[in-house]
Amino acid sequence: MIGNYNYGTGRRKSAVARVFIKSGSGQIVVNGKPANEYFSRETGLMVIRQPLELTNNVETFDIMVNVNGGGESGQAGAVRHGITRALIDYDATLKSELSKAGFVTRDAREVERKKVGLRKARRAKQFSKR
């Protein structure tokens, strides 16, 4: 990639997104596909556009994303986190606005591990009195 890019890494659950932004027309490319093709649900698109809409930069930047790991929801959250960090790299004055919306903080919730003797992380086997 040649040019003046701003970079941000985003993480959510087990997904990791590497986000590159540069001034352009508002095109978002995720893993070589347009964002509306990559994310099958509308909620994924809504999530990744949130920091851009908040800062009024929807048509200002071309965004290129490499994301791997996790599912669709986790990847969308990782992309949002990466876009937020890249916007802060571009203009540090946006940080307070993005922080108030809660986009800067990494959501640390992870899947709880399954325990031995239980069906799932917390679900026990059904108890029978008789």
Swiss-Prot record:
HAMAP family: Ribosomal_uS9_B. The lineage of its organism: Bacteria, Pseudomonadati, Pseudomonadota, Betaproteobacteria, Burkholderiales. Belongs to the universal ribosomal protein uS9 family. InterPro entries: Ribosomal_Su5_D2-typ_SF (IPR020568), Ribosomal_uS9 (IPR000754), Ribosomal_uS9_bac/plastid (IPR023035), Ribosomal_uS9_CS (IPR020574), Ribsml_uS5_D2-typ_fold_subgr (IPR014721). It comes from Janthinobacterium sp. (strain Marseille). Pfam families: Ribosomal_S9. This is Small ribosomal subunit protein uS9. GO terms for molecular function: RNA binding; structural constituent of ribosome. GO terms for biological process: translation. Keywords: Ribonucleoprotein, Ribosomal protein. PANTHER family: RIBOSOMAL PROTEIN S9 (PTHR21569), SMALL RIBOSOMAL SUBUNIT PROTEIN US9M (PTHR21569:SF1). It comes from the Bacteria. The keyword Membrane does not apply. The gene is rpsI. GO terms for cellular component: cytosolic small ribosomal subunit.
